Amino acid sequence: MEDFFLTCPRGLEEVTANQISKYISDDPIIDKGGISFAGDINDMYLTNLHSRTGMHLLKKILSFHCDDIDNIYKNLYSHDWSPILDSSKTFIIKTKCKSNFFKNTNFVTLKIKDAIVDKIRKQEGKRPSVSKINPDVILFIIIRDDEVKIY
């Protein structure tokens, strides 16, 4: 089972949960701006097919608890990025941050980018490029208090 997050417009979380509840194995958990659920690839496809109010269906890559920027760097640097990103690909990071520990979202995004490119550079000798226009990989980072989730 994988963890997913289906984004939707604020205020439509319940509607979105009702739309997908009969197509997924697990009960959806309503959150601000989306729905969390666990499922398999079949659940993912059915959610994409039947959700009318859902916008982005995100698959969780990594999650951890953290209360300082150095630990974010260490956690992301220790992750194996090779299944989704290598030096030949471009990527972008989109960060949403609501935390008393991390005040500057741009700085957090920069440290996340540094950890990822440093790891790939160490493994391959080259780093992937960041591209704002049509990147190969889009990473969504959601930080709430001390919880960091990477999709």
Per-segment meaning from a language model:
Residues 139-150:
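C-terminal edge-of-domain segments
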Residues 132-135, 141:
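Active-site neighborhood for divalent-cation/phosphate handling
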Residues 2-133:
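Non-catalytic nucleic-acid substrate-recognition regions in nucleic-acid-modifying enzymes
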